[in-house]
């Protein structure tokens, strides 16, 4: 389950049931999409137990509309607030858990991942792919384009998850709830069936307190215990609420096999 939390919002991905839909796909495109679907549904169960470092750079801006399309404006405006949160992410038994190590390079004490004010995210390790590719979600896929990325041949598919399998938005001020559809693109290497990137945008009612939520996750092959796995290396999350824009940039690094002797890193220190 993916949770994004602010003072006014909790986002929960629902798990309703229906059938996968495909439109305007060639036989080869449908074959690749089906192979990726099978991989996505098994993904979290095939990952080994591991530890990595998750570093989240959070900024809050004021007065920037359509921030996702203006994020590369130069010079970028100064944020109202910003912080950097370094966490140890432990993946064991198919579940993610987080230990907050530092906040702005200072030891974090007893801070908890989901108790921060502002926006935090989770679920990059297979949850979003399972929700999109699960036949129960009734996701509609269509062909978008062919491109290149870092020297790799890439096929891009558009997708849309309907309202009945969508995302629940709950306004914590009014307790008013909506379930909204979401849509995006998935980037696939057709030779290896690796997923390289996924994007999503929530289709939010105009009268809701949150105007926009966009997410992007980049994946690459990482080696753990001598074997290759396709894992997140970077994620971005943008949310617009009133005149405020919440902008998270998340990096994943230092993947290694989980063991009882794994090392925790605190900034420049290492603690056994």
Protein language model regions, located:
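Hydrophobic h-region of N-terminal signal peptides that target proteins for export
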Residues: 8-19
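Structured extracytoplasmic
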Residues: 20-183, 190-197, 201-215, 220-272
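Bacterial N-terminal signal peptides that target proteins for export
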Residues: 1-8
């Amino acid at each position: 389950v993916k949770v994004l939390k602010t003072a006014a919002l909790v986002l929960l991905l629902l798990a309703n049931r229906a059938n996968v839909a495909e439109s305007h796909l060639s036989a080869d495109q449908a074959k690749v999409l089906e192979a990726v679907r099978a991989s996505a549904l098994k993904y979290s169960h095939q990952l080994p137990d591991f530890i990595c470092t998750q570093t989240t750079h959070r900024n809050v801006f004021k007065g920037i509309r359509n921030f996702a399309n203006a994020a590369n404006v130069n010079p970028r405006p100064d944020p109202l607030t910003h912080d950097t949160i370094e966490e140890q992410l432990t993946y064991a038994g198919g579940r993610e858990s987080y230990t907050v190590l530092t906040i702005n390079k200072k030891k974090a004490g007893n801070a908890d991942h989901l108790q921060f004010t502002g926006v935090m995210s989770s679920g990059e390790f297979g949850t979003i792919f399972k929700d999109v590719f699960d036949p129960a979600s009734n996701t509609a896929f269509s062909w978008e384009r062919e491109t290149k990325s870092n020297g790799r041949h890439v096929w891009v598919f558009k997708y849309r998850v309907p309202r009945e399998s969508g995302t629940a938005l709950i306004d914590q001020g009014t307790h008013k709830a909506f379930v909204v559809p979401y849509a995006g693109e998935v980037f696939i290497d057709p030779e290896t069936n690796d997923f390289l990137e996924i994007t999503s945008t929530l289709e939010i009612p105009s009268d809701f307190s949150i105007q926009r939520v966009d997410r992007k996750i980049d994946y690459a092959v990482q080696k753990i215990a001598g074997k290759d796995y396709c894992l997140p290396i970077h994620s971005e999350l943008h949310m617009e609420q009133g005149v405020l824009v919440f902008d998270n940039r998340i990096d994943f690094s230092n993947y290694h096999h989980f063991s009882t002797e794994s090392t925790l890193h605190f900034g420049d220190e290492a603690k056994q």
